């Protein structure tokens, strides 16, 4: 068991350092740092259960059992969330007939969309070109490290790639997925005809959460699934798990 914790510590340290340089994966460094701390604490508790006096051994044994139970719960819930992500990662036939396509932001690089965001824009463009009566709503405000609102960069990309500007509306105030959808709904409630239909456009890993938030906002939980860069999928799945836990913990799920 002691060897297992040394392996976990080394793996967490290595993966954390690998994720640190990129803004896209940097958040995962915090998770892997937590793994290192967990492994170190469990290693210490294990030693105390074997070598300390009786009172310390009892306390260490209790804390060690709690650590094992917590890790088991995380593993089980993580696996369950991943199954839900897989079940949601598809395009619904109804999306082809949706009047409004909500494209969720995913970061920009100077005046160009990130690779992840580009796949969402490509999926939205293709769907919109198959349904000439649809309107695209690009969602995303301006981050502290960004020179432009994401929505503006998204609109420019779509226009450059064949979507008429008059078919695009911008929601440029939001800073997260919840606001993406909520602020887009405000625009639709003001300007769209009664009974309008919607579809959300995002990467497959993101659609479990996006569908739920769409339904929560009173919009159609219909989706267009964009492909995800294969090398980033593990990190994105980890992020979605953390987001799901945070939403549940803050009573927003």
Where do the language-model regions lie?
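Short alpha-helical segments used as structural interaction elements across diverse proteins
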Residues: 3, 23, 44, 54-55, ...
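Lipid-exposed faces of alpha-helical membrane segments in multi-pass integral membrane proteins
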Residues: 7, 11-14, 70-76, 80, ...
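A structural signal for short, hydrophobic/glycine-enriched beta-strand patches
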Residues: 79-237
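A transmembrane-helix-recognition feature enriched in membrane-embedded lipid enzymes
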Residues: 233-253
């Amino acid at each position: 068991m002691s060897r297992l914790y040394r392996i976990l510590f080394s793996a967490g340290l290595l993966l954390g350092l690998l994720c640190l340089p990129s803004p896209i994966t940097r958040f995962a460094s915090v998770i892997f740092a937590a793994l290192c701390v967990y492994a170190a604490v469990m290693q210490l508790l294990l030693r105390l259960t074997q070598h300390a006096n009786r009172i310390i051994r009892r306390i260490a044994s209790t804390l060690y059992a709690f650590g094992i139970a917590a890790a088991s719960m995380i593993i089980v819930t993580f696996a369950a969330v991943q199954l839900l992500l897989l079940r949601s990662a598809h395009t619904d036939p109804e999306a082809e007939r949706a009047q409004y396509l909500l494209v969720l932001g995913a970061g920009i690089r100077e005046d160009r969309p990130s690779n992840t965001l580009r796949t969402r824009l490509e999926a939205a463009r293709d769907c919109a070109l198959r349904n000439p009566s649809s309107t695209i709503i690009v969602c995303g405000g301006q981050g502290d490290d960004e020179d432009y609102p994401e929505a503006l960069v998204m609109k420019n990309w779509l226009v450059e790639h064949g979507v008429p500007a008059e078919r695009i509306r911008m929601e440029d105030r939001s800073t997260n997925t919840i606001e993406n959808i909520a602020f887009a709904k405000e625009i639709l409630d003001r300007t769209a005809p009664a009974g309008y239909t919607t579809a959300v456009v995002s990467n497959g890993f993101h659609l479990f959460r996006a569908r739920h938030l769409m339904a929560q906002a009173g919009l159609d939980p219909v989706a267009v699934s964009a492909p995800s860069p294969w090398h980033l999928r593990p990190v994105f799945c980890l992020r979605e798990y953390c987001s799901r836990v945070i939403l549940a913990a803050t009573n927003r799920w």
